[in-house]
C-alpha cells in the first residue's frame, strides 16, 4: 500500500517536472530564436523552434504509421461475438433524411443481438417526427416507444417524488425488456440524453456504444471496436474513424473532411499507440459498461468555475476513463460517416465550442498524466501551448517585420501545409489530401482567434451548434475573427504604405515579385483542382450510396 502510494507520488513529480521542463525548453528556444540556417536579409531562416515542431510532426507520423500496422495485423485476430452490446443514439431536432440513414445503418450492423436505445432531447409535438421515423425503420412490432414528461433529473409539472421514481423505473424496465427502444424526454441537453440511456441500461450489458443521430455506421463498426476491447482488459474505451457524410456540399465541409482524416488517422492513431486517445468522438465510440457506472454520476454533475458543464460530453467521458488508469484506443477498422456544418458561421461556432471543452478538459486531463505514458504529457504541452506561440509569431512578424517578412510567413504557412498534406496523401493513398494545405489558412484566419475567444468565454454555456432540422445562425463567432483581421490587415496596409516611400533594392524587389507570383500560382492551382474535383464528385454524389465504401 505504502509502496504503491510512494510510486504514485514519484510518477506525479516526474510527469510534472517533465511537462514544466518541456514547456520552459520550448519557450526558451522560441525566445532565443537560435537559427540553424539563414540567408542575407533574413529572406529564409530555419531555427531551433522550427526544428522542434518539425521533429514533433515526424515522430507523431511515425507512431501513427506503427499503430496502423498493428491495426492491420488485428484483422486476423479471431473474436467470439458472445459479449452483449447496447447502442445509445442521442437525437436532437435531427434532419429527417440524416436520421433515416442513421437508423438504416444501425439495422445493417453485423454484431449479433445488439440492443438499440434512441433518446430524443425534447418531448414536444415538434419532436414526434423522430419517434415516428424510429418506429418506421426499426419496425412498429419490434420496437417500444415512450413519451416521458420529464427526465431522470427533472420532474414533470405537478409530479410527486413517488410518481417520478415510478416513471424512472418504467423507463428502465422498457429498455431492459425490448431490443429497440425510443424515448422522448424533457429537454436537458446531450448529457441528459446520454445519462438516460446509461442509467436505463444499467449494468446488464458488457459494452455500450455511443452514436449521434446524424451518423451512418459501417456494418462492421461494432465488431471492430469490440475486438479492441476484447484484446486488452485494460482498454476502457475505443473510438473509430469518423468521416464526413456531406463533404461535397460546401468548401467548409470539404476542408473539414481532409482535416478529420488527419485528426483521426495521424493524431489519434499516434495517441492510440500509447493508449491515451484524449477524445473518443460522439459519432463512434464504445466503452466498458462496468467503467461507465463507476463515474456516470460524476460525469453528469461535472462543474467548472462553479457552473455545471453543458458541452464537451464526449471528451469528458474519455477523460473519466483515463482518470481510472485505463487506456483509450483508436481503430481505423471501425468507420462511420457524420454530418458537419456547411455554413462558415455554424462551423465557427462549433469549433469555438469544441475549443472551450478542449481547454477545460486539458486542465482536468493534467491531473492524470502520471497514470499514463509520458507521451500524454508531451503531446498535451505541445498542442496546448502551440496556438499561443503561433499568435506571438504572427503579431511579431506583422508588427516588427518588413513586407517581405509577412510574405515569407504566408509562403511558409503554405509550404508547411503542403509538406504535411503530401505526407498525408502518401499515407492515405489519395491525392485529395493535398487540399489539407488550404486548411492551414482556415486555421490561421479563423481557428486561432476562435481559440482565444473560447478561452475568454470558457465559462459561457450558450450558442453551440443548433439542431439540423432548423439551422440557427449566430453571428457572435465573427467578433474574434473580425478583431483578428483588423489587427493584421491594418498593420499590413501601414507597412506597405511606410515601405512604399523608400525605393526597394533590386534583391528585395526580386524576392517580393517571385514570392507574390508563387503564392498566387499556388492558390490558382489548388482552387482550380478543387473546382474540378467538386464538379466531378458533385455529379457522382447524387447517385452515391453509403452502404460499405466510406473512404471515398
Swiss-Prot record:
Residues 1-11, 67-374, 424-429, 497-510 are cytoplasmic. The keyword Cell membrane applies. Its main location: membrane. Its EC number is 2.4.1.212. The chain crosses the membrane at residues 12-32, 46-66, 375-395, 403-423, 430-450, 476-496, 511-531. Residues 33-45, 396-402, 451-475, 532-552 are extracellular. It is found in: Cell membrane; Endoplasmic reticulum membrane; Vesicle; Golgi apparatus membrane. It is a multi-pass membrane protein. GO terms for molecular function: hyaluronan synthase activity. It catalyses: [hyaluronan](n) + UDP-N-acetyl-alpha-D-glucosamine = N-acetyl-beta-D-glucosaminyl-(1->4)-[hyaluronan](n) + UDP + H(+); N-acetyl-beta-D-glucosaminyl-(1->4)-[hyaluronan](n) + UDP-alpha-D-glucuronate = [hyaluronan](n+1) + UDP + H(+). Keywords: Cell membrane, Endoplasmic reticulum, Glycosyltransferase, Golgi apparatus, Lysosome, Membrane, Transferase, Transmembrane, Transmembrane helix. One of its GO terms (biological process) is atrioventricular canal development. Pathway: Glycan biosynthesis; hyaluronan biosynthesis. It is an enzyme of class 2 (transferase). Catalyzes the addition of GlcNAc or GlcUA monosaccharides to the nascent hyaluronan polymer. Therefore, it is essential to hyaluronan synthesis a major component of most extracellular matrices that has a structural role in tissues architectures and regulates cell adhesion, migration and differentiation. This is one of three isoenzymes responsible for cellular hyaluronan synthesis and it is particularly responsible for the synthesis of high molecular mass hyaluronan. Belongs to the NodC/HAS family. Homodimer; dimerization promotes enzymatic activity. This is Hyaluronan synthase 2. The gene is HAS2.
Amino acid at each position: 500500500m505504502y509502496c504503491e502510494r510512494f510510486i504514485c507520488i514519484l510518477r506525479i513529480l516526474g510527469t510534472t517536472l517533465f511537462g514544466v521542463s518541456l514547456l520552459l525548453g520550448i519557450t526558451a528556444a522560441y525566445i532565443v530564436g537560435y537559427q540553424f540556417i539563414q540567408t542575407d536579409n533574413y529572406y529564409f531562416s530555419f531555427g531551433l523552434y522550427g526544428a522542434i515542431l518539425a521533429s514533433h510532426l515526424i515522430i507523431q507520423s511515425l507512431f501513427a504509421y506503427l499503430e496502423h500496422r498493428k491495426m492491420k495485423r488485428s484483422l486476423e485476430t479471431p473474436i467470439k461475438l458472445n459479449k452483449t452490446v447496447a447502442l445509445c443514439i442521442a437525437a436532437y431536432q435531427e434532419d429527417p433524411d440524416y436520421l433515416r440513414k442513421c437508423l438504416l445503418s444501425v439495422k445493417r450492423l453485423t454484431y449479433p443481438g445488439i440492443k438499440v436505445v434512441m433518446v430524443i432531447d425534447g418531448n414536444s409535438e415538434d419532436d414526434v417526427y423522430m419517434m415516428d421515423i424510429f418506429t418506421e425503420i426499426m419496425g412498429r412490432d419490434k420496437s417500444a416507444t415512450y413519451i416521458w414528461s420529464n427526465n431522470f433529473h427533472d420532474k414533470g409539472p405537478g409530479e410527486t417524488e413517488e410518481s417520478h421514481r415510478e416513471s424512472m423505473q418504467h423507463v428502465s424496465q422498457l429498455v431492459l425488456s425490448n431490443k429497440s427502444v425510443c424515448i422522448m424526454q424533457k429537454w436537458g441537453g446531450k448529457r441528459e440524453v446520454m445519462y438516460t440511456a446509461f442509467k436505463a441500461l444499467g449494468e446488464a450489458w458488457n459494452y455500450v456504444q455511443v452514436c449521434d443521430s446524424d451518423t451512418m455506421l459501417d456494418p462492421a463498426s461494432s465488431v471492430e471496436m469490440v475486438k479492441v476491447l476484447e484484446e486488452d482488459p485494460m482498454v476502457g474505451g475505443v473510438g473509430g474513424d469518423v468521416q464526413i457524410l456531406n463533404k461535397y456540399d460546401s468548401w467548409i465541409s470539404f476542408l473539414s473532411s481532409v482535416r478529420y482524416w488527419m485528426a483521426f488517422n495521424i493524431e489519434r492513431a499516434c495517441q492510440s499507440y500509447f493508449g491515451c486517445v484524449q477524445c473518443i468522438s460522439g459519432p463512434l465510440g464504445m466503452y466498458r459498461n462496468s467503467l461507465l457506472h463507476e463515474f456516470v454520476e460524476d460525469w453528469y454533475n461535472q462543474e467548472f468555475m462553479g457552473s455545471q458543464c453543458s458541452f464537451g460530453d464526449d471528451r469528458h467521458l474519455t477523460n473519466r476513463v483515463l482518470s481510472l488508469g485505463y487506456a483509450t484506443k483508436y481503430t481505423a477498422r471501425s468507420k462511420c460517416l457524420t454530418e458537419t456544418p456547411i455554413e462558415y458561421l455554424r462551423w465557427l461556432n462549433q469549433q469555438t465550442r469544441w475549443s472551450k471543452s478542449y481547454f477545460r478538459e486539458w486542465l482536468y486531463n493534467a491531473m492524470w498524466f502520471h497514470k499514463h505514458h509520458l507521451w500524454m504529457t508531451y503531446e498535451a504541452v505541445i498542442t496546448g501551448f502551440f496556438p499561443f506561440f503561433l499568435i506571438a509569431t504572427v503579431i511579431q512578424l506583422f508588427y516588427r517585420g518588413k513586407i517581405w517578412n509577412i510574405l515569407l510567413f504566408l509562403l511558409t504557412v503554405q509550404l508547411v501545409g503542403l509538406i504535411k498534406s503530401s505526407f498525408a496523401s502518401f499515407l492515405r493513398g489519395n491525392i485529395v489530401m493535398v487540399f489539407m494545405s488550404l486548411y492551414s489558412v482556415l486555421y490561421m484566419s479563423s481557428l486561432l482567434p476562435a481559440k482565444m475567444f473560447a478561452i475568454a468565454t470558457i465559462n459561457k454555456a450558450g450558442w453551440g451548434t443548433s439542431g439540423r432540422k432548423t439551422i440557427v445562425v449566430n453571428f457572435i463567432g465573427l467578433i474574434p475573427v473580425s478583431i483578428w483581421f483588423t489587427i493584421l490587415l491594418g498593420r499590413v496596409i501601414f507597412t506597405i504604405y511606410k515601405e512604399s516611400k523608400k525605393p526597394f533594392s533590386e534583391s528585395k524587389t526580386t524576392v517580393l515579385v517571385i514570392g507574390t507570383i508563387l503564392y498566387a500560382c499556388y492558390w490558382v492551382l489548388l482552387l482550380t483542382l478543387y473546382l474540378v474535383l467538386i464538379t466531378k464528385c458533385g455529379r457522382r454524389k447524387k447517385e452515391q450510396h453509403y452502404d460499405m465504401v466510406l473512404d471515398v
